[in-house]
């Protein structure tokens, strides 16, 4: 590389230096998590070890965006395997979450908040699977930084503080266990103040301890950590809370949960092939329909029928076409997507040129305000 000439951009004009190097790069949405990821590389970990350590710290420092109760679709490429892969980290709904059960509760839709909305939390098992099959480290190596920041605290970011403020009354009046964590001293933590989550630190510390007590190699310890999460004290606590507690949700009424320890024990994260779409000289990879990610692939299939190269990328025509194609793809999501373990999703048809050529005919120079799914024989399409 010539001195002063960037390999990324040969004619750079930036107010910040471009990130280049020969050792490794870590990026995340929080500087502490990024630093932990880089430290993991410097300790000899590989990219997957760094990703796992970074992810666990993000749960601590950005609790308004993710946490141990969440899900995670992972798209990865391991040079040793030579192909992109997906880890499904989307836990299923509880076995008891049937239409009959919600009808019995007087509900015609699953509440968007509260215990009834809870699925099997897929995050922990997913990161452990990634660590086992692609990483090199033990659970203690990737969890220790998160435990430290959860126990000792970190400067809470403005958006986390603001998000807690929006649910302050709800936590104070109806979610006392959440209030105990997120309203220290009974108040919303101001931006920049030191914020700790010692309950989370205790949880991960116990998992690390029980995994280490299992002895053996790293794989045995990882498997023990997964078991502790899905069949041990974590699953037991979730089961007990959902059975014994009722908390108010978006319906305005208190409800208990349907998630059980048996639901937790039945599910594990798994590796699968991505769904792909060839667009120009690129192959775009997304997780399966369970992630809703293939909506983007259908948007590309719709856009393929237009000469975008000749358009201003910030001009009204370019933006209009992108928005209208997105509307059609999302309408098809509403009509055809579902859990592939229970629903046959016609994804090959939804990504086909024949189908999308017909869908493009709906796009005019006028913005549509209607939800317009397609119609496929044997699959309905009505919403």
Task: Enumerate the language-model features and the residues they cover.
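Protein kinase glycine-rich loop
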Residues: 298
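Long, structured ligand/cofactor-binding scaffold of large enzymes
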Residues: 39-41, 378-379
């Amino acid at each position: 590389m010539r001195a002063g000439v960037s390999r990324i951009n040969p004619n750079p004009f930036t107010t910040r230096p471009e990130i280049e190097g020969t050792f490794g790069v870590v990026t995340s949405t929080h500087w502490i998590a990024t630093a932990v990821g880089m430290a993991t590389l410097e300790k000899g970990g590989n990219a997957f070890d760094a990703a796992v350590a970074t992810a666990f710290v993000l749960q601590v420092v950005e609790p308004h965006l993710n946490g141990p109760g969440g899900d995670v679709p992972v798209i990865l490429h391991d040079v040793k395997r030579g192909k992109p892969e997906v880890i499904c980290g989307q836990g299923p709904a509880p076995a008891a979450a049937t239409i009959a059960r919600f009808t019995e509760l007087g509900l015609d839709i699953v509440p968007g908040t509260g215990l009834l909305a809870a699925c099997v939390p897929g995050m922990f098992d997913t990161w452990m699977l990634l660590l086992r099959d692609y990483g090199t480290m033990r659970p203690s190596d990737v969890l220790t930084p998160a435990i430290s920041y959860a126990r000792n605290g970190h400067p809470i970011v403005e958006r986390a503080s603001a998000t807690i403020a929006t649910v302050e009354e709800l936590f104070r009046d109806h979610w006392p266990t959440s209030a105990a964590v997120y309203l220290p001293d009974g108040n919303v933590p101001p931006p920049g103040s030191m914020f700790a989550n010692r309950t989370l630190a205790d949880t991960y510390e116990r998992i690390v301890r029980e995994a280490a007590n299992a002895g053996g190699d790293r794989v045995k310890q990882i498997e023990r950590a997964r078991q502790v999460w899905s069949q041990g004290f974590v699953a037991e606590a979730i089961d007990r809370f959902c059975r014994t507690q009722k908390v108010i949700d978006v319906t305005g009424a208190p409800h208990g949960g349907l998630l059980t320890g048996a639901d937790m024990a039945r599910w594990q994260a798994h590796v699968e092939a991505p769904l792909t779409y060839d667009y120009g000289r690129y192959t775009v990879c997304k997780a399966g329909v369970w992630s809703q990610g293939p909506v983007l692939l259908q948007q590309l299939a719709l856009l393929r029928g237009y000469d975008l190269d000749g358009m201003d990328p910030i001009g009204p025509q370019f933006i209009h076409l992108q928005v209208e194609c997105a509307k059609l793809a999302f309408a098809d999501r509403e009509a055809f997507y579902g859990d592939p373990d229970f629903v046959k999703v016609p994804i090959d048809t939804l990504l086909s040129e024949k189908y999308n050529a017909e869908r493009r005919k709906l796009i005019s120079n006028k913005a549509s305000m209607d939800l317009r799914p397609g119609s496929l024989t044997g699959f309905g399409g009505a919403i």
